[in-house]
Amino acid sequence: LWSCTTCGACVNECPVDIEHIDHIVNMRRFQVLVESEFPTELGGTFRNLEKAGNPWGANRMDRNAWIAECDFPVTVIDGALPDEVEYLFWVGCAGAYEERAKKTTKAVAELLYMSGVNFGVLGARETCTGDPARRAGNEFLYQILSRENIETFNEVYSNYKGKKKVVVTCPHCFTTIGRDYKQQGFELEMVQDRKSTRLNSSHEFVS
């Protein structure tokens, strides 16, 4: 039950279209919320998510640390998103804290800057999307984290007149914000950076 990475490979290969992941997550949810039986390592992860807003318990203010390593300006959105900012770049936990993922974060930010795209980041206002909690069966914690982020998004886009467009590099953030949050009544136009993504002359993302 706990060895599954919820990658979806089994679902893609299943000849009768069984939704294995949904069943596995439901069983984990029962184990966590009803039986309180789960791997001890998850206890630390749950506490870190609850207290620090990331799986490792890192300082929330350190989400901005990668910006100091850039030789170009990066706008940190402190209040509502200005109309001139076209894209919100959602960095994510790994993109802010993990050294290898930070390289991707800086590369994407540089790509946006060099392409003349006006973008901004939330910095310390970000918190984990809740994907690790939901996948591990802690639906209660997921609801807390997701509502916090949805409230932040609503504040950011409170007076914004354009499309609500968000760039992400993390596939987990892409799925959670783009699909799971939509189930909670909140919808954004998601753009996932990948090798096949190109910027055309009007700065729109096409795959």
Give residue ranges: language-model regions.
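Iron-sulfur-cluster electron-transfer modules
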Residues: 1-176, 180-185, 190
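Single conserved hydrophobic/aromatic residue that forms the stacking wall/gate
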Residues: 195, 199-206
